[in-house]
Amino acid sequence: VVTSTSIGKLFLAGIIPGILIFTMFSIYSYVYSRVKNVGVLPRASWAERWQAVKDGALVLGFPLIIVGGIYAGIFSPTEAAAAAVAYALFLEGIVYRTLTWKKVINAFLDTGIITGVVFILVGAGQAFSWFISFLRLPQEIMPQIIGADPTQLKLIIIVVIAYFVACMFVDPIVAIYVLSPIFQPYVTNLGIDMVFLGTLVTLQAAIGSATPPFGCDIFTAQLIFRRPYWEVIRHTPPYILMLILATISIIAFPGTATFLPNSALIN
């Protein structure tokens, strides 16, 4: 949104890297469970599997509405989010009949609080971005960083490191609003694909947010799973390493991020 890059193309760009990351995580989890002798769950019967399919069938409507609606040109990203909320209300209120007015009001309140926090962060990020532009810091600092003869690879590495480090300490939304206006002119001048770079930036936001000591996702996981801080971060290094390897793979083979967007009929 900040750089006017197609949301639909960014979704597509993440599919192949997502499969790569999924594969690495799966292999690591399998090896870890074998080495640590974690054990396996009892094999589910075909009846249990079919029941699980029936229970989860309606929930699969969410990715169809959000991703499918955006790809098909039916919804904008904002409209897709609203349609998903309407679908959730339909499932909970009509199909499962578990929705009450108290739950609706609490959901509205929680959403309002989260949205308010996000907008405060976005507003602060935009203000800081304007301040940086006003002081002409990009024009003063960037030439010193990228040198007199910048190349695509050099700039990509600088962008990756900058977003990775920034997202270790602040919310990714703030990092994107602050850093994007600094890098965008140089990215455009060097002809770097914005969808390719957006995929890398999104990945760095995920890595930085999960990196100790101040990654936002660490504290989120701590609150959700109610585990001590040290217990949460103790298991993150292997996954961070795999995400870094995925980043290197995408940089080495840009087609992993650009093939599907370039093949799709999405503006």
Language model region names:
Residues V1-N267:
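Alpha-helical transmembrane segments of multi-pass membrane transport proteins
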